[in-house]
Amino acid sequence: TALFAQVENAQVNGSFQIDGQYYKVDEAIGITSETIKGQKVGINGFGKINYSLGNFTAGIRYEAFQTPMSGFDTRLQGFGIANYYASYDNGTIAVTLGDIYDQFGNGFIFRTYEEWALGFDNALRGMRVIYRPAAGVTLKALFGKQRLYWVEYGDAAKRGVVRGIDGEWDLNHSFET
């Protein structure tokens, strides 16, 4: 119908994961009440949903660490919307607002990523602009604050403020063969 003709190319996808452990004191293998800190269960979970339509994409991720599993940083304790973003990319220019995962070059200077199995996430909440003026040439600028567990983003004194620019020229894509 005409009502739905505008959204036929929209896509929604997502994923979720729940990891859990049940703790039982077993002094024969070194598990004591002290090592499990009185906890009976540790649960780490997340769910994320992404939406795309044409040049636009958006997404959100909910996380819950109730209580974080043994071996994970206790500062992960909590739950809520951990990440969100909206992005527009027409091939020449791309703008992203929200949580950004990226790297400059091979990642030695700047790299943000999340590794769920390790409880690591240093997403950058801010803005990124990518400009591709010619084949093989990419210019990138970004600004934001790094994630620090569940500390509010407004508390700048407790987190890193990152500003950066990056330029790349891939000669293999610049010349026709």
List each language-model region with its residue ranges.
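Sec/Tat signal peptide C-region and signal peptidase I cleavage site
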Residues: A2-A5
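Outer-membrane beta-barrel channel domains
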Residues: V7-T177
